[in-house]
């Protein structure tokens, strides 16, 4: 019967089931946990790849990444599937079937050990358009995440590069797939048209203003494919705005020039133009914004400006136009995207990247402006600007440029045709193969037939010659001089003041300003001086230009410029003296005199970085000027002759008193200090001793006091006493004496004795109420209480008991009364304890 025993119902389908069912259930649980872990890992990888795959560098998705990750669990439709649908849906195939062309290309499946340089070298090795940027996505550990982005300057460059490589690359023996990178459309949120706030998909009312979701859906359906899209309202990057950005603006262009250039096409006022300037140099950063009333007018103006032939020019520079990215958060595109707020710095970077892709062909009468197209000459060298410009840039800055050679009297100047490529910084560089401009050697040999101004004598190679055309000043190459607070231009040797926007020529001691129309530096003088400096060959155009200059008032006069230069010239006079003493011979030092403000500025400017200045070409000429200044006495070419050393007579007089005495105490031939009686090995050691030695300063002070008269000594002592600290407390103690010190405080005080009433201290008499009551009841004095007089005969005495001791406990009472003092209580307690020990 044991073999025929069947499994009971409780064993087969009871609470825990059979052993076979339990094993099968364990296997299913293990597989389920493994599948869940694989799904979780796959979901994390897909979420990170999806973000980097569909994001664009300027996309607002980057700012909303955290909210998107937080709401991943809620997505169940509109392209975002729920958790159960991840394994059944292929995002890659669905997305790349309808991918849109973009100027950013994504490389997927890269090796882990690859870096950005490897990708950049491989991409640049191909013929054709060169990329603008290559970015490899990395993890926190520094390893590659397996994909990278290659960004091109234009959409046509990216498409041509993709077609040339057939959307595949071979990197380190591995085939890499290439795809266009585009931002994923947002379906999970809806935008409120009233306040511009993005709300969660499940919210039926706006969180901020309470507007209904249905109203926003009717007015602007988010993510709808049927949304109207107008090509006139969109630029290449896919955004729309009522503002237009003007790129490649000259550094000295003003708002009036922009208004006059746009006047034939649109009516604007000054408030519609915003010209962006650098905070340090106060020059234009290369772009401006034009704000229009509506996007329709902006699109119409943009279409007109983009179809102009020749293109729009402002102050002789070809200007590029495009829609500007709005900084308002409520700007919504028809496809549901929101343009996030972009700072001016990001716009400047975009403008610089845009300008680096342009080719401006300039000539005397005008030129063409267009992008380099595939197949054109020089397209293969599209990205070699940074490599090719170096030798030509050095050749260009090694000598002063002169594009218009002076001709005979009455003949018009002949402009030299040049072509330049605008690189990432707003500088003009020559292309390979273009005719180079004439150098200073040609300009020095060819002189005008007749000029009213005197010719420059022995100008150094990098000296600025008035009337010669130069390239537009590039403030990005200026070097900041800490000693003077000015910016040094290594190309022209001029010093630039960002406050007054004037240049200072330290060789000729002149203030210059940049003229954008003439492309040259002109002296900041009156109109007569400027007109006299022009050649006779340009008399026809000088009168017209003179009228235009009169209409444009100067921001600062020559007097104001001199006052600005005077501030820092005073502070550096002392350093100038030390600098001049280190180079002048002893005979020249004995004949020191006050110098003009222009000379002070020149010495202060040339004092910076003496080691670097010695290597420059104009340093020997400057040294000759310093040494022979007192002998030749050239005419002062500064703007204001009224300013000289007289403005700081007090400081100059105090300094000269010590300087004359100190020079007599130094022997520069023997390199010895006669005051301290010390000899030094070289000139530098003697100079350091003179400037830094405390012993020399003390001896010099003693020597000066010995040469002073009694009145001078008294005046000096009085001045020193006034400058010293006055101890008024000591004077007060001397006058009124020192008060008695307070008595020291006692550490212990005797407790105050309180005399309280003690009526039973001497015993109880017969006058108390208790005694009278007992006598009324038949009690007699001396007998005990009770029926048989067996009770106590004396009253109960109040006693102090030990804490915690019962009434009958041993040692509960030491016989201490309430009237006993502290000493009596301690004495009785000690005696009781002693008795107990016995």
UniProtKB/Swiss-Prot annotation:
GO CC, alphabetical: nucleus; spliceosomal complex
Compositionally biased intervals (Low complexity): 440-462
Signal sequence extent: none
A molecular-function term among this protein's GO annotations: zinc ion binding
Alphabetized Gene3D superfamilies for the sequence: 3.30.70.330, Zinc finger, RanBP2-type
Domain RRM residues, every copy: 103-183, 242-326
Pfam family, one: Zn_ribbon_RanBP
Region (Disordered): 1-86, 396-473, 524-561
All copies of domain G-patch, residue ranges: 766-812
Similarity comment: Belongs to the RBM5/RBM10 family.
Its biological purpose: Component of the spliceosome A complex. Regulates alternative splicing of a number of mRNAs. May modulate splice site pairing after recruitment of the U1 and U2 snRNPs to the 5' and 3' splice sites of the intron.
The protein's name: RNA-binding protein 5
Lineage: Eukaryota, Metazoa, Chordata, Craniata, Vertebrata
